[in-house]
Amino acid sequence: MKPNRSTISILVAGCLTGSVAVAADGPSPDGASACAYTADVLARPRLRGVMSPGRDMTEDDFKALADWGATLLRFQMIRDWHSVNGNQDLDEYDRWLEGRLDHFDRVVLPMARKHGILVVLDLHVPPGGYDASHEANMFHDARFADHFVELWRRIARRFKGREGIYGYDLVNEPLQAREALPDCDHWNLLRRAAEAVRAEDPHVPIVVESNQCASPSQFAGLRPLPFVNVIYQFHVYWPWEFTHQRVLNTRMWTVEWPDDSHGWNRAAIDWTLKPVVAFQRKYGARVYAGEFSAVAWAPGAERYLRDCISLFEEHGWDWTYHAFREWSGWSVEHETAAPGRPSVPSADNPRKRALLDGFRGRISAAQPSER
């Protein structure tokens, strides 16, 4: 789809005033426009951090993150993530969402600014919820799709000009597998939401996740949205047999990292990220690794984290670990020997050391995990 008139106006005005920098040279070979970013977005330092807990956040949370060296928080507005066909009473959904936005406005943003942390505003559960296959219903029901677009218009109007926002993360892990309604497929629905944001706020970055639950593979067919300051996000939990071993099925076998018998190592993670790297280079895109993790009892979890972080650093990507003070299985402040065993608070462990080394810039492309 070609940029509409308002989009072209934003791009032209920015280029004429010198406020917009195009991160790649001209159009790409497929005719899509190169990504464009304002100078302040291009000048951001590397940002490293965590996913928020689902609960309200406290001063202690932010103090801990600052002490660790984190500079980025992905604030997830989440509830009923596993429910089927939830979040369909839109009046009630809006009341819940306003409550989360109030907490973001009154607590999260001020505390984050105080501690030098930028915040991603993440809509983790869309209006209309998910069907039994976890496909978002808004791709197949115009009522939910239209509501999604308009809620982002309201959010952008409310937070226009506010400091400390890394970007508006339009929807977490979108999944559209079946044919969508016209103008409601993954790309077009996110385009419509981005257009609504830009009608209210021409500057704050928009964060777009690839289809198939933010899959790196989906970057192969992704086209940039025709707006300034769009950041492209992926998640990596590969191989799932390692990162999620015995999380949903306690009878799964135990897998160690790395496992060369399966070809599971740093080079294999790098291979799965090739479509993201190609997209970044082709369009000059800013890229953000929004989620990665390995469950606490996975043998070699700390090596997996170091390998992921070293790749993010190699490619110049911001990143956030999943998750901070959420479930103990992901928490680096707990140690758990196996599923069903009690979680033990832990002030120091190999996974936490890996994460803090990452925050403090001590993991580079030349310093992956050691066997």
List each model region and its residues.
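Aromatic-lined substrate-binding rim segments of carbohydrate-active enzymes
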Residues: D60-G128, H186-D201, Y304-F312
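Surface-exposed, active-site-proximal loop segments in enzymatic domains
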Residues: W81-L101, P127-R143, Q176-R178, S331-P339
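Active-site region of glycoside hydrolase catalytic domains
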Residues: P29, A142-G263, D270-V295, E314-T320
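N-terminal carbohydrate-binding accessory modules
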Residues: A23-R95, F279-Q280
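Bacterial N-terminal signal peptides
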Residues: S9-S19
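Aromatic-rich peripheral "rim/lid" segments of glycoside hydrolase catalytic domains that contact
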Residues: P299-R371
